[in-house]
Amino acid sequence: MITLRKSLSKSCKDLRILNGTTYVKGFCSTTTTDTTTTTSTSTTTDTDTNSEKSNKEKLFHQINELTKQSSFNKVLFYKKSAHETEGYSYKERQQFKQKQQKIKQIKHNQQLKQKQQIEQQKQKKLEQQQQQQQLELEKKQKFEQQLEQQQREQNQISLLEKSKDLESINDFGDFDFRELETKPLFSVPNVLINYLENEKTLSDHQKSDVVGSFYSDGEIPSVPHINLEEYTRSVLIEAYLEVCKPEYAFYYFKQSENNKTNSKGLLLMIEFYIKIGDIDSAFKFFEVNFKDYKDLISTNDYYKLFNGLITYSIDNQENIFDIKNKFFNVIINDNINNDIEKFNVGSLASMIESITPKYQPPPQEQQLMDDDSNSNSNNDSNNIIKNSSSKLEFNDDCVSNYKKLVNFDQLYSIYKNNYKKYTSDQRLIILSCILKYSIITADIELFLNTVNRVLVKDGIEKVEIPILQILFEAYTHTIPSDKPELVGQLKYLLTNYIKDMDSSDNGYKSISKLIAYNFSFKGDIKNSIYDQLCGIGIKSIEIDIENNIENSVLINKLKQEQREKERNQFIIFIQSIFPEDRIQHFVETALIYLINDNSYQEAVKLYIYFLKEGSVTGIDIFLKYHELSYKNIVYNNNNNNNNNNNNNNNNNNNNNNNNNIKNFTTFSENDHKTLKTFWERIKNNYVNNNNKQQQQEERDIENEFIFIGKGEINNDQLLEKFQYIKEFRNIKSFFNSYEENLNPNDFINYIKNIINKVNDDDNDNDNNNNNNNNNNNNNDDDDGGGHGGGDVFKTTTPKKVKPLISTIQKSQNELPTTTTYKEIIENTSFFRNQQYNFNRELSSTLNSPKSRLDLERLQSFLNCKSHTESMSFQQLCICLELVGDTGFKYDFYKNLNHIQKTLIITPQLCKNLFSTVTMDESIDILRRGLSRISPENLKSLGIWDGVFQGLLKDPLKTPLANFLMYNGFISKSSFDRYSYCQQIINTDIDAYYFFLDPSISYYDTFGGDIEDASNYNLKKDSSKTFFKPMEDFFITYLDTFFKASSPHEISQRPDYQTQFSNYTILSLIRLGKLNEAFKEIESLSPAKYNATTIGLVVFIYSKRYKQDKSKFLVEIQSLIQRIIFDLENKMGSEDARSYFHKYILKSLIINYGNIEMDNLIANVDVPKVLKDIDNSLAPNFDRRLIRKLFKVRGYIKYRFYRLN
């Protein structure tokens, strides 16, 4: 276009303008200025240039033709002024303009045509490139598939040829397996077989233990008919398959004379074919041999095999339905109703579950979930509510595939025909699958038939909670919205059968647990049921649980809107399904479950909700909740001393039977009236007053509630503390204000004091009240159980026991003078259940800004010998805890100065303490922080003397000795360590022996790996390392020992020197002094080496010759020869070999990770060594060592074949 314009400009000379039209000599054209035209940066090819020239020629030709037709072509226009153009008519000018417009249109069309041609050429080239790439890709894929197919066929042909070769040999007599006898892998099992056959002294259990050593999972199955020799053959099959020699495994498989005992081998062979990807061979092998073994293959083995096939098909993108059909065709053989019974229903259901399509939320719901994850906290709850109300949706493909995979008609018919053969767990699993399937596929008939089976044939008392939860899910979530008849049918069925249920039925408890579950967000109820539901796979109620939060505050972290939404859905379900007169019983029982599960807040929520809805009489639930909580928390262990009525003795035994609803009507009519009056007063007189002053008064009252303790409380104090109780009328406001940290004790004490206050209003004085209670005890026996009525708070209160928290007052002057700390400490209610309740209460007390303890009185109490001698370990710890005032954080000795200031720890106190506790309790005390105190302070406090005096009374000193060493108890200081060690030596020389050489326990601790043990101190903080004082302590005490021990003692224990050397070597290794350790080793005769010594030697050699492996092997082999030579000289050839294999070889094997075991195996006569192992086996040989020695075979086998 630009080139054309330039050409035209050059040709245009002698222009003359007429009414906006430029007349050109020879031709005319309308020219306009295009200010927006941009020049192209692309390079024009020769082809494009030629094309452009031809186009211009055509264009010129068209323009000339037009101008020839014009009457103006005869007129030559020269450059003249405008007035010289006068004389032309309007018509002539218009004709000329029209021709000019035609010319312009022709040019425009030509340009469009040219652009289209260029685009077409580009598109054509792009398509050609794509076609070329596609062809190359297809060619490459085809080549890879052919290559893979060839490889697979080659492998299969190779395996089949080997199998045919083996099968063609008559009785395998011509097959030479003698080469196997020369390899260590196979010599060990043959030795084992000979050993088992020839050894008559071992029991069957010992033989099983030996055979079990071949397996990492331990003992062989305890099946009576299994022949040990045949079972060992499966060991050989497994060994061959591990080294990819299936032909040898097949040899042993076919060699078995009794095929029925070799089912293990069959499964191993099939698993091997699956592992190498030869599914056809696996199925063929399975099908050919299945008939011989189907009666012996366990359900678990079937399941493992099936899972292996499914996993393979998924990993390799095989058709899962083909795999499934092949598998079931082999097992079922067109007779499903008979053979499928051999299939454990639970396993079958689990298989179905493993390949069941999972629910995927619809796109709009997923969007809500995505929005929720990206939104701020203010919008989280709204999205969750939207999400939680949606129905389950499954696409047609999902349902279709599911129907292909599982024939539920057959499954259901099997269930109906074999109902009595199933356990309750199996029924639960299979019914869950059927229910789930019917919901997914919207099969109303199957769903109703199944529910009818659950409710009618099974009876709801046999229905477990997950089934009920599925029905609840179906009712509220999963039933398709276009199937209202399903909801109606379900409601009808549930309502009819729940209405006639007796409270003794199991189903009664199940429904109550279901209610408790839907109100509980923590504890055993929640966890156990939630796990079961997740296992079944039904979409459960979505609850935002944060597992890292303390249970006591978990519910407060859940989003309020979501919680209420789900709870309300469940309440609607309960109220629409359950008959009105039955809801109360279920809710009452649910309350019991919640309370027993320590879900107090949830119980209160449940209680308040039904009170608010009016479907349950609030006061009745309140009474039962209050009484039960009171029993469980406050006076669980106290006896009812004031109950003089013998008729009630039997009823008192029912106090702990919290699961029977009939035992909770223990309040007399007078109690009901009193509490009902109180309750009505609260409900009717509540006024919502926003006055700040009144709110502050209420908060002050609430704060006072926290510090009311257990035990007897003076009514005068209550009157003073709760003078504003009438204004604080609504108990619900108390719950709401303490939702963040509601403590059951707060609630109980709050209720207790309110009731006492009401009783004070209704009765003249306490004496009259007590008299009334006694009268009630005599007159209200028909009310059943418990305390026989009356004011339970007063009749059950121990008169002489004051609570510790009652000492918390506004000032010390208010401390009751009658309280004795011995009574506090000896109150058993403080120490029951491993002090759980007490610790919780104590912790809140000590952390409270209002807490004040009479430390001086506690000090005087603790420093009294008669007191401390009668105290238990736990009681003393709590007293010290109180003095330390650290809030029960298990480090109350941390600040020694604080303890010294607040408590006079006398030597007498410590000696009394540590001489009465056991060794474990001493260690516990030490762990709690005494190790942070310097030995000097320990000595000055007398604690050290007390510790050792307690130790010397206990014969088991090794744990404490190890503990002392690990914690660096004996450090570099002026502290007289020698005298204490001397005390131990003088008392029990064996104690000192263990004290100095806990190296054996190191083997147990670190699994026998000396390298890990030697690095142990490096992983710890340097100030707490065990070996900080090692250099100057243990070696020095070797001399101490010998000085304290007589020559006779040493001669009686010749291994002492070895043990001391071992510990010296280990100490030097940990100090990094390998040269000194090596010298110590060389100074010790090899004949005195034991297993620990050899382990240390191998470790040091591996470090010393780390850069020269050949030198290392030479030294090790030389060492072995020296050891055997010295041992033979000392104890004879046979004993020496037995000793060698018992200790030396064991150490080499235990520490194989620290040495070049590959090279050692390659250079040592391994078959001879293994033969020596066999020769060393004797009836009195350590069974554990037998197991370890045979486990060596697996490692040597692996290493040997990797090298060869």
From Swiss-Prot:
Protein biosynthesis found in the keyword field: no
Biased composition (Low complexity): 32-48, 374-387, 766-778
Region annotated Disordered, chain positions: 32-55, 360-387, 639-660, 761-797
Ranges of the TPR repeats in the UniProt entry: 263-296, 379-412, 583-617
InterPro entries in UniProt: Glucose_repression_reg (IPR052292)
Repeat is among the record's keywords: yes
Keywords noted in UniProt: Repeat, TPR repeat
Signal peptide, first to last residue: none
Name of the featured protein: TPR repeat-containing protein DDB_G0287999
Source organism (scientific name): Dictyostelium discoideum (Social amoeba)
